[in-house]
Amino acid sequence: MMKKYTETPIPGRDPQRILPSGVGLVCEGGGTRGFFSAGVFEAFMEAGILFPHICGISAGAANALSYISGQRLRSRQIVEHYVPRHEYVSRRNILLHRSMFGYDFIFREIPEEHIFFDWDVLLRQPISYNAGAFDCNTGETVWFGNNDLRGADGRGDLTCVLASCSVPLMSRIVDYKGGKYLDGGIHCSIPIEKSIADGNDFHVVILTRNEGFVKPPMGHEKLIRMFYRKYPKVAEALETRHTVYNQQLELCENLAAQGRAMIIRPQAPVGDSRTSTDVTVLLRLYDEGTDLGRTATSELLKRFA
């Protein structure tokens, strides 16, 4: 029996062109601020281009999947119809699931029951996909790739992306393949070093903060150490997160000044909340991403003609 979805299915499509080897796409996270990145991806899909190497953190890794599967406007439908629901993000979820974000709703119910996810198109793309998660025991960023998106039964599996998205203090630790993981942004918010290490010589960096943003210390050190007393590496990384973030941001800006990177980011401050459910604000952010993505696409096509 054919699966029934509550929304009209959006079939995936293959890209018209994959950019040359050595061009990497770097995607910051940021919770629902990540719908800015989804808007940029919409512009890339509109132009039919796909990057040969994609590395993302948290929401950046998650939103990139609809881009790789070529499902235009899928992320926009999620903003319009599902982000406002309490199952997506709410304090109620903390009581029910011990997590602000409803990860079962986001990673299982939406793609399986509401807006189908085109695994066939995603899994056949000849690109390198990398989702970063924080290993709570070692304190290192672990990278999950294409093979991790395919479960033991051969079907699509989003558990590795869930591990990348599990926001500290707001979410439960994710058990996956013998490890314990939280949001990759704890130690690697902007995965530019991963893109460099994997051999890329030009990087398109999508940020979810405006130019001039400097990440402040998280604070509440004693509370964090108590909360993660069983996982001291998590507390240590959270205490230095702002320093690492600002260093990664500086590296991106230095590369851009050298002509080795292109940065796409919101033009105005977008607020501190990663849990905003204001549809008007999020759609405005999405549309801004699409507009800036179109400009970036024109530059990319000229550069790699």
What are these regions (language model features)?
Residues 1-57, 65-305:
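Patatin-like phospholipase
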